[in-house]
Structure formats: C-alpha cells, structure tokens
UniProtKB/Swiss-Prot annotation:
It is a single-pass type II membrane protein. Keywords: Aminopeptidase, Cell membrane, Disulfide bond, Glycoprotein, Hydrolase, Membrane, Protease, Serine protease, Signal-anchor, Transmembrane, Transmembrane helix. GO terms for cellular component: plasma membrane. Removes N-terminal dipeptides sequentially from polypeptides. Essential for control of distal tip cell migration. The chain crosses the membrane at residues 28-48. GO terms for biological process: proteolysis. The active site is at S691, D768, H800. It is an enzyme of class 3 (hydrolase). Disulfide bonds join C514-C533, C711-C821. Residues 1-27 are cytoplasmic. Glycans are attached at N61, N66, N183, N209, N314, N359, N754. Belongs to the peptidase S9B family. DPPIV subfamily. This is Dipeptidyl peptidase family member 2.
Length: 829
C-alpha cells in the first residue's frame, strides 16, 4: 500500500506528493498572490486616508506615560501642493500618553544645603543619593523615594499621603500617615494623622528646626499641633470654629487663586518656636453656585462657593495670628494703622520669618515680615511682628514720577534676610527712564524702621529673589532679561557690603544653547543653585551650579539628545516694531520642509494678561506642535503691551483700561507678520485664546470685524469684568465706583452685533469656579439676540481647565479650523 504521507513546510504551506501535491502547490501560489494584492491595496488605501478621524472615539487619555518613542507617521498633508510629504505628529499621538523628550526633573534641597534628585516619570531610583554642600560627589542617602520628600527636619520620621478629594487648583484633602526612619530605612509600623483613623487632612507642616519632628496640620479647617509623631491622640487643637466659610491655616478660593497661589497659609519660624497662620472669613461674602450633574440624583447638585466680585462691599476678611509654642499663647497681629481704618479691605500678600539683625536685638531673635496691601493693591506695607508687638518697617506706594501701577503678589514673595535687614523686589526708576522691578535692600535700625539703601538690577524686571548668602555675600534672582524669549538666573557677588558697582552674571551664558530656564532655585544656604536648561525639541538639562564659581557646575541629567520621531517644525523668535512704539516679541512655528512660495494659514494663540509672558525659547506645547505638524499651518505666540518683564513702559498701558492696548498691538502684530513673512496667507488667519486670552479674542473679533482675523476661538472667556473676582480685577482696574468707564470698556456683551464677517467658536465649562459660565451664558445670549451665527461648546461638570474633556475640545477646535476656517479647495478633510 502507498502511503499518503506529506511534509509540512516551515513557511506554513503544505506540499503534497503526486497529483494532490500539484493541486496543493497551485492553491498555495494563488493564495500568496491574493495576499500580496490585498497588501498592496491596503498600503495604497492607508496613504489615501485623512490624517485623523475626529469622529472616532478611541478613548485616549492624556497621561504621563513612559519614554518610548512615538512611531513616525507619514501622512498626506492638508495643503499638498504647498508641502512635501513628511513625518508628522498626529492628533492620535498627541493623546497616546507617549513622550518624546524629558522636560523636567524633580529634586529637593535638604536644610543643610544638600541636593537630592527625586524619582520622576522616567527613572526609578531605589537608592536615593545626595550631593552635600561643598561637594560634587553623590553619596547614599535614603532607600525610599516615596518618603524622601516628606522627611521630618531631624530625618527620624516621614509622612505618606493619599489624595482623596481634589478641591481647587492648588488644594486637596488627603489621608496622612507617619512612618519611622531607622538607619535610612522605613519602618513597617504606621501612625495615622488626625483625630481619627481616617481623618481628612488639608495641610501638613513639619517643624523646620533641624532637631525637631513635631508638626502642625489642618483638619476640618482648624489648626492642630502634634508633638510626638507616634501619638496622634496627643494632638492639641489650636483653633476652634473652623468651617468651609471660616478657615484657619488654609487659603480660601480667592487667596489660593489670586494672592498666595497656594493653599498653604501657615508659616513656622526657623527656630520652631513660633507658628503664624491666617484666618479667612467668608461668612459675609456673596456666594456662587456651581452645578454638578450625576446619575445618582434626579436633581442638579449645587456647590456653594464664596466668591467676592469686583466692587462688592464684603470682601474676604483676613486675620493673622502667631502661636508661641513655649508659652502656648496665641496673639493676633494687627495690620498697619493705615489699613485698620479700611474695615478689613486689605490683603496679606506674603509672610516670611527672618532672624533679626544684631542691631535689632531689642526686637527679639525672630520676627515675621508681613507684606500687606490696600484693596486696590497699589500701596504695600512691610511690618515686623512677634508675639509681643508689630512695628512698621516700610511703606511703599506704587507711584513714581506721576506714573502709577499695581503690585503683583508674586513680586514680593521672595523675602530674604541680610545681616542688617532684608531683600525684596520693588519698582525703581532706571537710567533709561523706564521703571523696572529691582531688588531692594531694606536696612533696619534698632527700632525696626527700615529704609531702602541699595537697588540691584538692570534694564529688565526682576521676577523673584531666589536666595541670598550672608556668608559669601551673594544674591541670586530670576529675570527674563532683555532678550526675546529668555528666562535666566542672575548672580550678584559682593551684593550688599561692597562699595563697588554691582555686576550681574547671567547663568545661562555658562551653557550652550540655553536661553530659557525651567525650574530654578537656590539651596537654603544660598550657596548653590539648580537650573534646568530648556532647549527647543531636546531633553532638558539639569545642572547643579556653585554660586561663587559657576565653572564648578555638574550636569546631572539631559546629556543625551531627544529622539524626535517626526520632522521638527521650524521655530523662529524675534521682535517687530509696532506703531505703539514698543517691540512686539514673538515665537512662530512653521511646518518642516516648507516650500518656497508656499502660502499657509496662521493661528495666533494669545493670552496677553497683565504682567504675563508667552514667548519662551523652549519646546512649545504638544498641541501647538501637533497642529503645525499635521495640518501645515503657522502657529504664533506674542508679547505686546501689558505683558511682563520689560518695565512700566510696557505694562502701564493697560492699567485701569484692560482690553484696549493689547487688542491694538495684537492686530498690528498680525499686520507685521503679513508684511514680514511671505508664507502667511492673509485670507486665512485665526486667533485663539483661553481665559484672559478668550476675553481678548472676543475684543479682537469685535474691533476687527473680519478685516484681518477671519476666525476667532474663545475658550472660558471673561466677557464682563464685573463678573470676575475682586482681587484680580481691582488690581488692574481699580474700584468700579472710581473707574466706571474702565469697567464699561471691558464688557463685550453690548457689542455682540459687531462679531460679523468672522467665524466664531465659544467653549466653556459649566462648573468653572474661576471664570464662571455666567460669562459665556450672557455672551452667547447676546450673540443669539443679534442673529450672529457661531459655534458653542458647553462642557457639563468641567472646571476652568476643561482637563477631562481636552480630547473632545481639541478635536472640535481643529475641526473648526480645518473644515470651517481654513477651508481650501485642496485636499479637504
């Protein structure tokens, strides 16, 4: 009998012997041919597809994934006759969670000046190392990255936390526990924080004294003190009567958002003897009600939020206290007499404990420097307080040579002691006639009265004092400098006690291709700084730098170049002279491989808020890169009148008249772009803005009426500043009763009929605690009443950032731009 045996090839085709084998081989050949044909058609079909399908719901989440490279994608460009085929960064990749470069490194300073680099999204460090002060060599420090940021001052305990409830931009509620540290190892035993096992803790602060491990915390809006970390039942309640509308040690919405830019309102003294804290009384403040829609309730839920608006009589009432831990005594520190008569209409801008100079020994060893401001925020007062009394150190009005401006809380946030007084930032007239924020040395006499004895700065605004070391007499501060898109740390040696003219060293000059610094800080001793150099489309570089000798620098991270899986857009920085007399600064992205003679649309992304800055020489936002790369358009950001870094000559144009100079300069910048860059298609120009930028976008649409700007995208805009909060609005506009016309001019609602010849998109979250949906509700109603065609997106349960709906928002914005605004006869989506 003949066997019907057959062999099976490794390739997967069976080959039979005899007639059956011939038939089988024929079938196999036909099958392979069919597969090849299908493959060829699949490739052709793939390249004929539009870049993205915004109608599909792929469930992408914007997360901070790993470092694996994005896969390069070759797509047919939107305007194919203008561009060569190139590798593109797509909408799907934008929300893939994958990262193509490292833009930030986390670190901490220890109280002795040692540097410790933290775990981050890209590196897992089981063994933490530190670089001690005066050394360049890393040594073992701690074996647990989870707790290293939470060590007690004596490093014998640490806390762990788990977020339970998100509150506002900077605040949340947590479950805390304490662990013990033995030989730099975490114990298994834990102790809870709070009166009960699962108490929600709103803030936690270790005693900063190097030999201490006691702490204070905030629970249910009251402040507690605990001496022994292992005995939660021994905690002492320092305040009573705390509630949502009467907070101790925890900022209310207004202070968290507009004054402190943090939820923290507790300050330990360096010795650990004193604790100062603020009380925020909103019981008489008007409320807003934020809606929440759920499946659990057939009725709408409303959250009640105290929110003082511009011009209201009852603003937040703030009171300051000092607790003396030795005498267990709490005293209230009174505001300056000039403010006491204002019936609580004042602000506490910042607090900083300092060791008193030797000639002020009668004032005690430590005093709290408090910076107070009147309600209009154009007059500040520096007081020195302890548990016995307060003395006025300095009063400073923001009026120089009949010119007036506001104080920004961030300007005075960096207060540092010297041997004879303290340093802060205040405005000062420069040799060029402009008025800039400079470092001021306030020298104190034996009574605590101060006077400014020295100014340090050049022809640009100082942003923040980072540190000062009396030991080496060296000052460090951050500033934008006088270049376009720059941000650097500056070092001043022989800063206080030399008769020589002070000279400034720009730290970024020490590094190649480093014009903009990200995070920058000085160690607690003021003798070393950490800077993070941001270079466009490359990994950020992390440096540890010696203040005395900047050649002694260590690059800790960022030595490898980023691998970018798409063709990098071209990036331009520059300035253009405007009719207003100032130089408008800009950053512009254009597609890679842009052909000569090409004409492409322009999207101008604006913010423009007072004292803000948008132009930086660093990697743009991922959204900006994607929209340029995928759709072959130009994207720009600008800094014009009203923005920060260049003194009063630029800023003061918007004081008490928001929405005027910024709009004029923005339109003039667009004209200058058209005249300067031949690739811009003047018939396809769009402006987009969020928050204050949304306000300016609407103002531009009203003023321009489609002459230059064909499309406007306004996201979460202010439409009438009487709807916005008191602290921000009155800082720039003053009181409505004193500047009624200034407020009237910010109201876009009566001008809805002028939004003509422009395609308009409006988006807003209904649960926006910052810029209330009331703004867009009134604005859209006016547009409807005037018969204006526009597109509106309303996001239920979303706050100001729309963070949970960005996939949808960006998709709709891009659909609006490409299908409605930049519509072309070429290769439409």
């Amino acid at each position: 009998m003949e066997n019907d045996n057959y062999d099976v090839e490794e390739q997967g085709c069976s080959v039979f012997n005899g007639k059956h084998g011939y038939f089988a081989r024929s079938c196999c050949v036909v099958f392979i041919l069919i597969i090849c044909v299908i493959f060829v058609f699949s490739v052709i079909f793939t390249f004929m597809q539009n870049p993205i399908n915004l109608n599909s719901d792929n469930g992408f989440n914007q997360t901070s994934g790993n470092t694996s490279s994005l896969e390069a994608t070759t797509l047919k460009p939107k305007f194919s006759s203008l561009m060569t085929t190139t590798r593109r960064f797509t909408f799907e990749q934008l929300f893939s969670g994958k990262q193509f470069l490292v833009d930030y490194y986390d670190y901490i300073w220890l109280p002795d000046g040692s540097f410790v680099q933290m775990n981050d999204d890209f590196t897992i460090r089981k063994q933490m190392k530190k670089i001690p002060l005066g050394s360049s060599v890393a040594e073992p420090f701690f074996n647990n990255g989870e707790y290293v940021k939470a060590l007690s001052s004596n490093m014998k305990y640490a806390y762990g936390s788990k977020k339970v409830n998100e509150l506002w931009r900077h605040s949340a509620e947590y479950l805390y526990h304490i662990v013990k540290i033995n030989n730099k190892t975490v114990s298994t035993e834990q102790w809870h924080v709070g009166p009960e096992e699962n108490s929600l803790i709103q803030a936690f602060y270790w005693n900063p004294n190097a030999s201490s491990n006691d702490f204070v915390y905030v629970h249910n809006y009251n402040l507690y003190y605990q001496k022994d970390p292992e005995k939660p039942d021994g905690a002492i309640q320092l305040t009573v009567g705390g509630s949502t509308f009467n907070r101790f040690g925890l900022a209310n919405w207004l202070y968290e958002e507009e004054i402190l830019e943090a939820s923290s309102a507790v300050w330990w003294s360096p010795s650990g003897r004193y604790v100062s804290y603020l009380r925020f009384d909103d019981r008489e403040v008007n409320r807003i009600f934020l809606p929440k829609y759920t499946d659990d309730d057939s009725y709408v839920e409303y959250f009640e939020l105290p929110y003082p608006k511009a011009g209201v009589q009852n603003n937040t009432l703030v009171t300051q206290y000092i607790w003396d831990s030795e005498n267990h005594k709490i005293v209230e520190t009174a505001p300056p007499n000039e403010l006491s008569a204002a019936n609580g209409d004042y602000y506490v801008l910042t607090n900083k404990w300092i060791t008193m100079p030797r000639n002020g020994s009668d004032l005690g060893e430590e005093r709290l420097v408090t910076v107070w401001a009147n309600r209009d925020q154009n007059h500040v007062y520096f007081s020195l307080c302890n548990e016995q009394d307060c003395v006025m150190a300095l009063s400073f009005q923001f009026s120089i040579d009949n010119r007036q401006l506001w104080v920004s809380p961030k300007d005075v946030r960096g207060v540092f002691p010297t041997e004879t007084g303290f340093l802060t930032v205040l405005p000062h007239k420069h040799d060029d006639g402009n008025i800039y924020n400079h470092v001021a040395h306030v020298e104190l006499d034996g009574t605590g009265t101060g006077k400014i004895t020295k100014w340090i700065g050049e022809n640009f605004d100082v942003i923040l004092v980072l540190g000062y070391s009396s030991k080496i007499d060296a000052l460090t501060f951050s500033a934008y400098g006088d270049g376009v898109g720059e941000f650097s740390t500056y070092i001043v040696r022989e800063a206080m006690y030399s008769n020589k003219k002070t000279t400034l060293q720009k730290v970024t000059d020490q590094f190649e291709d480093c014009k903009t610094l990200g995070s920058q800080s000085a160690d607690p001793t003021g003798q070393r700084i950490v800077v993070q150099c941001e270079k466009p489309f490359d990994n950020t570089r992390l440096y540890l730098v010696d203040v005395v000798d900047t050649t002694k620098k260590i690059m800790l991270e960022g030595g490898t170049k980023a691998v970018i899986p798409f063709d990098v857009p071209n990036m331009k920085f520059g300035k253009l002279k405007l009719p207003s007399g100032i130089d408008g600064h800009y950053m512009m992205l254009t597609p890679a491989n842009l052909l000569d003679g090409a004409k492409i649309p322009l999207l101008l992304d604006i913010y423009g808020g007072p004292d803000s800055k948008q132009v930086f020489q660093k990697t743009p936002t991922a959204h900006a890169i994607q929209i340029v790369s995928q759709y072959d358009i130009a994207y720009a950001r600008i800094d014009v009148r009203g923005t920060g870094g260049r003194g009063w000559d630029v800023k003061e144009a918007v004081y008490r008249k928001l929405g005027d100079a910024e709009v004029v300069d923005t339109l003039d910048m667009i004209r200058a772009f058209i005249n300067t860059f031949g690739f811009i298609d003047e018939d396809r120009i769009a402006v987009m803005g969020w928050s204050y930028g949304g306000f300016l976008t609407s103002k531009i649409a009203i003023k321009d009426q489609g002459e230059l700007v064909k499309c406007a995208i306004s996201i979460a805009p202010v439409t009438d500043f009487k709807y916005y909060d008191s602290a921000y609005t009155e800082r720039y506009l003053g009181q409505p009763a004193e500047n009624l016309q200034g407020y009237i001019n910010t109201n876009v609602i009566p001008h809805a009929r002028n939004v003509t010849n422009v395609k308009y998109l409006l988006a807003h979250g209904e649960r926006d605690d910052n810029v209330h949906y009331q703004n867009s509700a009134r604005w859209s109603e006016a547009l409807q009443q005037n018969g204006i065609h526009f597109t509106q997106l309303v996001y239920a349960n979303e706050a100001h950032s729309l963070s949970h709906k960005l996939f949808h928002l960006y998709g709709e914005v891009q659909r609006f731009l490409m299908n409605d605004c930049f519509k072309s006869n070429l290769d439409l989506l």
